[in-house]
């Protein structure tokens, strides 16, 4: 069956070297924290961890926008936590064949994997077509063509990152991303207090969290 999906591959840079130098136990702790972050972000963004790949993961989204945000959130969490190992990621979207119910065959999944391979530390590389699905607070920088192993023609790439907060930084109270207020989604909690969000889904979650609990009278 042919479907349209978006794919992200993310992994820990330098994990093999870190394991050789620091030992198995510290490496296991770093990997456990990485996987916990990926699980939590994927669950919150409505994307799915399709498989674990040792020190990496393959993430699949029905829509491209939530996948882009998920990858940038994972990178931001790793940066804020001063993780011992930085992450890198590659993204692509397009039609693929859903094979035996749980695997995907096609150019987009292969491209996303290769982009993760060529990305540097703290880089999120994407096929340029993903720019059409990015929220306003995401910047597509360094547009260029690159020869990718396994692909006949050069691929046009961009590096995705959050816009610098500028003079009016705001923090999404749900996911913790720091955004420029001019590009954030304005909203409010159920109590009417103003707030800013990275996405309508975070705005909806905040509204639910702040909704007053109505006591049910005893009968």
Regions inferred by a protein language model and the residue ranges of each:
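Short glycine-enriched loop/turn motifs at secondary-structure junctions
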Residues: 1-2, 51-54, 116-119, 188-191
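Catalytic NTP-binding/metal-coordinating core of nucleotidyl cyclase/transferase enzymes
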Residues: 1-69
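Conserved catalytic motifs of the protein kinase core domain
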Residues: 2-5, 86, 193
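Residue-level signal for well-ordered alpha-helical positions
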Residues: 21-22, 73, 137, 209
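Intrinsically disordered, glycine/charged-rich C-terminal tails and inter-domain linkers
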Residues: 128-219
């Amino acid at each position: 069956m042919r479907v349209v999906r978006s794919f992200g591959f993310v992994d820990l840079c330098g994990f093999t070297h870190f394991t050789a130098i620091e030992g198995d136990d510290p490496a296991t702790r770093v990997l456990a924290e990485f996987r916990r972050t990926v699980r939590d972000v994927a669950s919150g963004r409505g994307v799915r961890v399709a498989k674990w790949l040792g020190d990496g993961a393959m993430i699949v989204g029905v829509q491209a926008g939530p996948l882009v945000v998920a990858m940038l959130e994972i990178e931001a969490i790793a940066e804020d936590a001063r993780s011992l190992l930085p992450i890198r990621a590659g993204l692509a979207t397009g039609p693929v064949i859903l094979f035996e119910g749980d695997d995907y065959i096609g150019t987009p999944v292969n491209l996303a994997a290769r982009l993760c391979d060529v990305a540097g530390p703290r880089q999120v590389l994407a096929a340029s077509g993903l720019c059409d699905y990015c929220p306003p607070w995401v910047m597509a920088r360094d547009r260029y063509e690159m020869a990718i192993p396994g692909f006949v023609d050069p691929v046009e790439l961009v590096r995705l990152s959050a816009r610098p907060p500028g003079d009016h930084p705001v923090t999404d109270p749900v996911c913790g991303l720091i955004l420029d207020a001019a590009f954030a989604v304005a909203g409010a909690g159920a109590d009417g207090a103003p707030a800013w969000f990275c996405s309508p889904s975070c705005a909806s979650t905040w509204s639910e969290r702040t909704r007053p609990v109505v006591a049910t009278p005893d009968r």
